[in-house]
Amino acid sequence: MPKAEPVISLENVSKFFGPFQALKDVNLTVSAGERVVICGPSGSGKSTVIRCINRLEEHTSGTIIVDGTELSEDTQNIRAVRQDVGMVFQQFNLFPHLTVLENLTIGPIRVRKMDKGKAEALARKYLDRVHIPEQAGKYPSQLSGGQQQRVAIARSLCMEPRIMLFDEPTSALDPEMINEVLDVMVELAGSGMTMVVVTHEMGFARKVADKMVFMEGGQIIEVAPPEKFFTNPDSDRCRAFLDQILEH
């Protein structure tokens, strides 16, 4: 991949929750079109990194620059960044009283000031892309978990982001529903979308990642291309983690 100016840059980022240090001097860059997968044991700081990139958590020290904008206490900056950064969570966070179509159009209409007809056309385009166009008129409670997560992905895409963040998007799903969500994410990766994904799904990571990141104890322990990461990682801690997770 040709070197490009990073669209995400974290420099010496630390984060405290009270006395607990969740992130310790984290340095990470993500280039346009790059797919980065972050893995590591529970409590290693993976989700905190993702949440800091979208300013859902405020970092304590260090510098975070997203798409040329430094994240600071300037709310205008934060609003601008969030319009260009989509996020998909473990939980689907759909509005239960709105139809699927309404869940997808509310952001473009209210935030992007798009007219309703254009927003609905955009929503149908992305429902088609995640392979559930027939669910537009249903309510979230009428859908399976896998379908709800695909709606959540489509909802993020309706904001036409330049970057997509995924925080363990399959961890709340039944096993038989995981692949239908991962398949959509593989297709999205193939389209050239910049993606940062926290996941334990190593088959997915092997398939799409340009760069693997292993975290433990709030620190980045290893960064490597997938072919090296999965066959010959430098750190013993990373090797032990992979031995454990790849057994299952």
Model regions and ranges:
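ABC family nucleotide-binding domain
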Residues: 5-226
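C-terminal boundary and immediately downstream tail of ABC-type ATPase nucleotide-binding domains
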Residues: 223, 227-248
